[in-house]
Amino acid sequence: MLVKIHTAALNGLEAMPVLVEVNTQLLQGQQAEEQRFHMVGLPDNAVRESRLRVLSALQNSGFKLPGFMRYVVNFAPADIRKEGSGYDLPLALGMLAGNNMLPAESMQHIVFVGELGLDGSLRSVRGMLSIAIKARSMGFDALIVPQANAQEAAVVNRLKVYGAATLAQVVAFLNGHTDALQPTDYDTRAEFAAAQRIVPYDFAEVKGQIGVKRAFEVAAAGGHNVLMVGSPGCGKSMMAKRLPSILPPLSLAESLETTQIHSVAGLLAADSSLITQRPFRSPHHNISDAALIGGGTYCRPGEISMAHNGVLFLDELPEFSRTALEAMRQPLEDRCITISRAKYNVTLPCSFMLVGAMNPCPCGYYTHPTRPCTCTPGQRQQYMKKISGPLLDRFDIQIEVTPVPVDELSTAPAGESSAAIRQRVVAARERQTERYSQHRGIHCNAQMTDHMLTELANLTPAATERLKMAMQMLDLSARAYGRIIKVARTIADLEQADAVSADHIAEAVAYRSLDRRDWAEA
């Protein structure tokens, strides 16, 4: 008897349909000595091992299969490698239906995904949101998943999602006991709006550092990458962690995409649904290239994709592998990463704000107001050369951070709240959304192309003259020219100004500390 069950496989962020075909045959005579279980269709080790899990789960759930049966299982399409443990549930149901222990027609319009424990319990699998989206797009009526995945899958509207704790519950439901499983209710928009109000960090907690906080406001308003240079303990990490709190709130579409990435990576918490806060990722500097960019034997999103729609913070930037840092250059421009391996070729999104932090020299105290630096100009220059020019070029805002005096820490009042700063940032982003509405793929000032600078930046004659003067007097490099205009345009947007003035240019020039040719030579 041949039974067909619908399930799905992951390919990058997307899910693709997989048909599990289970052919059951009674063995007689000498055939009884033959191997009784065959799997075809490019299953990996985890899928091959499912045979033992499924047989034990069936036995411990009270289902007794007849002896001397041969099972041939095909995972179609057969030319795509099948990975993971999510095929356990459809395989078990196929074996039961092949032995007339449940009606095969009851499974025709349902997608089944889930890992089985030896006791028949259902365990969560990764990528459930992508699978639910695919199931709805293909017109299936329902999706049966482990209970721990039900909230995640129920985010997708117009699809019935049933969460099951055990295999026995699923079998009872398919045998007509409709009260064995209940559909999971989830009001996506209401839950999303409620969860967005939680902000874990606030700029009001930061004492002093008025200039640095202003730089972060400009960065958030224009989507600019930021590089902080300062001695140890001056608050670089503290401020970087608070950057997501002033970024515009995630839209529902951004939230769905961000949740998909975390789900595929297996990092979405059990019984959770949507990620409603912008991600903040801060990997250690000994991270491998594959962990940062993505890849591996089985494709996994890297840190740059995990930070999609959020912030990637690289502390101690010069300590990161040179190859890992250089590998980020193209994804920073394209806002996506294509990973090609022998077994797969996938493209993952990675549109994020990059925030880097580093010491100004090997000893760390070159810019410290009281502690003397013990490094020579040559040592400082050599230290800075660990960051290549093309990567340094990706940082629109480069600022020096100095320690806050002790008396200011104890007496200074609370700073401006993140909520107040965010209001100005959102207003500036709205102006940019309107400005770039006719330019596909451009959403903020940091993404402007070179030819758009002349067309859309709108510099006043005084601003143009101030920029020329700054380039000459400060001996700024050529790559700083376009970056200054982009940042100045953002400063103008924060002030709701249509044109970029000379004052806007002056502030933008102040954010190019490391671009001076004489930096670190003193």
Predicted region positions:
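Hydrophobic anchor at the beta1->P-loop junction of P-loop NTPases
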Residues: 228, 314, 357
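Basic, amphipathic alpha-helical bundle interface domains used for macromolecular binding and assembly
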Residues: 40-51, 66-67, 74-84, 298-299, ...
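Peripheral, non-AAA+ core regions of ATP-driven protein-machinery
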Residues: 1-227, 231, 237, 340, ...
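Catalytic P-loop NTPase motifs of RecA-like helicase/translocase cores
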Residues: 119, 314-321, 364
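Walker A/P-loop
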Residues: 227-269, 334
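P-loop NTPase nucleotide-binding/switch module
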Residues: 179-218, 222, 249-304
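Walker B catalytic acidic pair
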Residues: 309, 315-316, 327
